Amino acid sequence: MATKNSKQNMSVLLTKLGDRDTFTMAARELDLMARQIDPSSSSGNLQSFISVILSVDTGDKPAVRKHCIHLLAVLSVSLPLNSLSPFLSKILTRITRRLRDPDSSIRSTCVAAVSAISSRTTKPPFYSAFMKPLADTLFTEQEVNAQIGAALCLAAAIDSASDPDPVRLGQTLLPRLEKLVKCNAFKAKSAGVVVIGSVIGAGGLSGTSVSSGGLKGLVDCLLSFLVSEDWAARKAAAEALGRLATMERNELGEFKAKCLKIFESRKYDKVKAVREVMNQMMEAWKQVPDLSEEVSPPRSNASSKGDASDGRYPSGSRVGSTPAKSRTHLVNRSTPPGSSLATTARKQANRKSIDQKKTSLTASLTKPNVRRRLEWKAGGASIPTGVSLEDEQHCDHDENAKETSHSSHNTVQKLGGVSSSLNGNIPPSGATMVTGHHVLSENPNSNNCKGLEDISLIRNQLVQIEQQQANLMDLLQRFVGSSQHGMRGLETRVHGLELALDEISYDLAVSNGRMSNGSSRNNCCLLPSGSFIKSKFWKKHDSKYSASRMSTYRNRNAETTEIQNSRHRFNGSPGFIVNPLAEIRPDNDLQVCLTIEGRRETKPSKASETLKTTV
């Protein structure tokens, strides 16, 4: 009876969820009911509650469907561990059906519910409880919303599970995921990359023996998504690469240089969220040890005595190196005692045997010294010997006391190899060379060389920025020049219109007899050229005076015309332009009559007839 009443109450509350006015009240009551369920009671309240929740179908309103899935998360959090294990298969089946819902908020609620249930479920095992049903949905669904939802649910379940079975994740799921995200038929690539990141974060690579080729394929797969047009795929790939650098940092030395170059070219993403993840991922990859850092600790001084059997090298001044790991390949060269650099170093070692123990390896070689040696290398000349090397080292000690000993080792050994090659056909022997009073090992991955490469890259970027600024300045100058040209053209046209109006005023005044031919040249501006006036301004082309004046001014330049116009307008003195038509003569009996549709035209005077003839 109690169970029946409980189902009725829940049905009423679910109905109220569909109404916007009663949604808040019904949601609060359902959450309270879910928290008060006792799973140990024999009344079956938990089973009836879950059955009512799962009975909601697509015919209900989206708010009802969404809150019913939310109630599953509330149940998993409020109930003891493994309380929902008997209903887990039914719950996941219903959730996978909800993943096809076009409403993205419902899919997000499904992901949150799966995460909550996974965190509170330890039995049955993760593989059979979550990974198998969700992975089957991910690999078999053809609808994009279902693919996205299944991938995100699987990733949330892996992240939240207390024991996600990382060995099986790496052996079974990860290879299939790599093939899936590379398939063109799979639309939810960003969600698939999220699952790969979750598998890496759960220890899927460390829990099984992954070959170098398999790791390289995974890194290449993730790098390919950094150039994707989908910003979500770029963000997911950056997160996965960051987790990979955190979990498998000791196995990524051979990929570090290549990956960091790609990261540098992609870190300025246009999406802020992607930029933030990129920066975090780059910091994680910078912590990955280089190939040179995988070398074991140096040998003792006693073990290196055999390398100096001739007695010319002081004891305690040699830094040897043991063989590297299988992935590290170091080529060591030494400078024979006959070379100029070795002779200078031997003399300095004999002179400064006391200071030898106090001076650190950092002071022996610094960035200016490396720069000078690189210049000698580029010039094709051998490295100078004698006292200048000692002065260089002393100056470098004062300026750069913070240079690391590892970078000094690498740079000196590399430059020693160059010097030995320049001094003749000297065969490489052993594993050391002498510079100053230190015997150093060669390291091809020199930090100083990397610094020089970074400086060269920065210089190239600055040159590109300078070129872009120069192009912008050229564009601005062209724009300003075209604007000035347009203003000059407009000014010329306006000036031509003014001249045309003055010419018309002059013709009307002459035709009306208000000015004589002699005085008109002092009161009106003359037209410099016929190109300023369209043909519609000329009513008669047989005017002798106009034709003669047009031919007179056609060959004059603009400057002469402006001087002449200003002289005619102002009569040689400051004042306004006088329009002859504006003068009113009281003795003039000119009558101009307008004829409009049937009105009789008055008899014009002699002056009006002359005006009509002119127009």
UniProtKB/Swiss-Prot annotation:
List where Polar residues composition bias occurs.
318-347, 407-426
Where are this protein's HEAT repeats? 44-81, 86-123, 125-163, 168-205, 213-250
Which Pfam families does the record match to this protein? Answer: TOR1L1_N
Q: Which residues carry this modification: Phosphoserine?
A: 456
Q: Which SUPFAM superfamilies match?
A: ARM repeat
Q: Which GO terms describe its molecular function?
A: microtubule binding
Q: Which domain of life is it from?
A: Eukaryota
Q: Which parts pass through the membrane?
A: none
**One GO cellular component term:** microtubule
Compositional bias (Basic and acidic residues): 391-406
Annotated stretches, region: Disordered:
288-446
Return the PANTHER family for the record. Answer: MICROTUBULE-ASSOCIATED PROTEIN TORTIFOLIA1, TORTIFOLIA1-LIKE PROTEIN 3
The name this protein carries in UniProt is: TORTIFOLIA1-like protein 3
Query: What is the native source organism of this protein?
Result: Arabidopsis thaliana (Mouse-ear cress)
